[in-house]
UniProtKB/Swiss-Prot annotation:
Species for this entry: Maridesulfovibrio salexigens (strain ATCC 14822 / DSM 2638 / NCIMB 8403 / VKM B-1763) (Desulfovibrio salexigens)
Official protein name in the record: UDP-N-acetylmuramate--L-alanine ligase
Catalytic activity: UDP-N-acetyl-alpha-D-muramate + L-alanine + ATP = UDP-N-acetyl-alpha-D-muramoyl-L-alanine + ADP + phosphate + H(+)
Pathway as given in its UniProt record: Cell wall biogenesis; peptidoglycan biosynthesis
Keyword tags: ATP-binding, Cell cycle, Cell division, Cell shape, Cell wall biogenesis/degradation, Cytoplasm, Ligase, Nucleotide-binding, Peptidoglycan synthesis
Amino acid sequence: MRSRVGNIHMIGIGGSGMSGIAEVLINMGFTVTGSDLAAGAPVKRLLKMGAQVFIGHGADNVNDADVVVKSTAISDDNPELVKARELGIPIIPRAEMLAELMRLRTGIAVAGTHGKTTTTSLLATIFTEAELDPTVIIGGRLNTFGSNARLGDGQFLIAEADESDGSFLCLAPIITVVTNVDKDHLDFYGGQEAIDESFRKFMNSIPFYGMNVVCGDDPGVQRLLPSIKRPCMTYGLNKGNRLRGEILSCEVRSLFKVYLDEKLLGEVSLAQPGKHNVLNALGAIGVSLEAGLDPKVILSGLSNFMGVGRRFEKKGESKGILVVDDYGHHPAEIQATIETAKSCFPQRRLVVAFQPHRFTRTEALFGEFCKTFEKADELLLTEIYPASEDPIPGVNGMSLAQGIRQVSDTKVRFYPDFEMMQNELPNILKPGDLFITQGAGSIYTVGEKFLKYLEEDGEKVLKPEEITAL
């Protein structure tokens, strides 16, 4: 097959899902080229691995391609897609390429509106610790690997399944995880009924001998369970779940007991705090048990989990100001981050810098966003990150700021660009503050530049590994 498919070209190769697939393909021996609008960290990593990456999209980039893979963010009028059609080059979506890779292994697909990346990463850590040598494709950088992908020789392929455009239905996993079913990606689905139907098809697509590991605490999952015709293992914190967690503490670290059919399996100490991370860990435990792993090996693997990039990630501390970055961009995810921050650091003033992600999401969930920041002490809001979307009249950062002020006592400052926010940070942040950069776009650079500013000003900046708290 490699001799027939000489060159795989990937449009949007720097994306979280695409870059992981590209890395696995390179390690399998394929020649990979690609294009993206910027040379971010994933692109730089792929370049070091031998990929040829064009910065910017151009028709000539696909001249030598035998097959073209496109990410969900790429529009049909992209010049590379247009040229590929003219040349008769096969074009496949990212999910179909992932499905082809999954056909070669026993597939484990992790789906859900929130928690996919962390749950997939927990599984990757457990299976690696168990010496199962899995192939892994994740939507974020797993700190243990220093990457979002790895090629293994073992039978399992563990992948994050993207529901945003329904393409996760291309996958053919043996085991699935569904962390939750919430309202999101309404630009594609239109409403909750279509979202539910997509997850219903996903869960019913596994073979009769497979297993759906699903969060029984989630209202969306509860809504679907009566119509699922394939085996299901429920997990959660509530009684009635087959796999149940009992939280002992989730401040600074998460400490909890695990029960299977109300029989104690053991106790877990997870470095990542928060109730949502306990649920993510329970999902990973459920899959691991279904795969036949020894409970002691599973719990040991969880204790060695080092976290995922951009998931409540410590960036540094200086002048008593702790800087944390988090990828969450849905109201439920942001609320989980804020609750975790307040639980871990009740004595610190919480300042959140939030960059909304997509005009369609901001419009569809406007009311929820307005109520999301009530527990923050101060909110620094910037303009919406478009993610290739066209603007929607009346939907912008300023309108969101006004909406938040109407329903919340949280102090809100709006900045049309990062530079204006950056210039004011030294006057806003004080010793003892917790500063969180929040969002799926480039807001993380604000925290990084603030720490660099302090360092250049002569202040000592503690690196993440030097920070004793959390």
